[in-house]
A protein has these predicted regions:
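Residues that define the transmembrane beta-barrel architecture of outer-membrane proteins
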Residues: 26, 44-48, 83-87, 104, ...
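Transmembrane beta-strands of outer-membrane beta-barrel pores
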Residues: 34-38, 66-72, 93-95, 112-118, ...
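Glycine- and aromatic-enriched membrane insertion/assembly motifs of diderm outer-membrane
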Residues: 43-100, 113-114
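Membrane-embedded beta-strand positions of outer-membrane beta-barrel proteins
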Residues: 30-32, 52, 64, 89-91, ...
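Extracellular/periplasm-exposed beta-strand and loop segments of Gram-negative cell-envelope proteins
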Residues: 39, 67, 71-84, 117-128, ...
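Outer-membrane beta-barrel "beta-signal"
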Residues: 88, 92, 201-220
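Short glycine/proline- and aromatic-enriched beta-strand/turn motifs that initiate or cap beta-hairpins
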Residues: 12-55, 65, 210-220
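Short loop/turn motifs that connect adjacent beta-strands in outer-membrane beta-barrel proteins
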Residues: 15-26, 59, 97-105, 162-168, ...
Length: 220
């Protein structure tokens, strides 16, 4: 009888300890980069960027981002439009030590990115170093198709769990252009996914703000 009581007591104790063990959730997360929608309020721009990741180890995530950008540019030298799609893939590594039951992240990561796009020039000025008076702008619709670019991104960011499986995040990105196809006699002033391109400078920066939802698959 005493052995039975001791066994039952140990069983209850083990059950209580097991109930206190918090299991980590593994699943697919999908999200929206809302910085695109914010830009649409202040610029001649529209775009959409979707985010997806999956945890493959305790701190390691495989990440894919796909999107589309349409950007109008108008300055003293040129009036043009750039539009196209892009895809980015890479890894995030979580540096943050969570308390049991929490799923917050402070991470570093990288992306390898590619974009396919086209540009349309509506007006432009011809530069002449010997000209003293301002040049009238030439009006001529010129469409450049089949443009492309490749670059890499280094990233620092965070994701915080607002509610069960719902996250908000932000990231700062340093971009390095690797290769781009440019139209004859013109430059790519904007590359979808990379953002602004400046002459003789292959670097760029970007900030993202994201809302992310996790579809839990397993806990372990």
């Amino acid at each position: 009888m005493i052995f039975i009581l001791l066994f039952n007591s140990n069983l209850r104790s083990q059950t209580e300890q097991d109930s206190l063990i918090t299991k980590n959730k593994y699943g697919i997360r999908i999200g929206l980069d809302i910085s695109k929608q914010i830009r649409m309020l202040t610029e001649e721009y529209n775009g959409l960027s979707l985010y997806g990741d999956i945890k493959i180890k305790e701190r390691l995530f495989i990440v894919t981002e796909v999107g589309r950008d349409n950007k109008n540019l108008n300055n003293e030298n040129i009036k043009s439009k750039f539009s196209g799609n892009y895809i980015k893939t890479g890894l995030n590594y979580n540096l943050y030590n969570n308390l049991p039951g929490l799923n917050n992240e402070i991470y570093v990561g990288f992306r390898v990115a590619t974009s396919k796009f086209e540009s349309e020039v509506f007006e432009y000025s011809i530069y002449n170093k010997d000209q003293y008076w301002s040049q009238d702008r030439v009006q001529d619709n010129i469409l450049h198709k089949d443009l492309n670019a490749n670059w890499i991104e280094l990233i620092v960011g965070f994701n915080t769990e607002l509610a069960n499986n719902l996250f908000m995040g932000a990231s700062l990105r340093l971009n390095r252009m690797i290769r781009q196809k440019e139209p004859a006699n013109f430059k790519n002033l904007f590359v979808p996914g990379f953002n602004k391109v400046t002459e003789n400078n292959n670097f760029g920066t970007a900030i993202t703000y994201s809302i992310i939802y996790q579809i839990p698959i397993i806990k372990k």
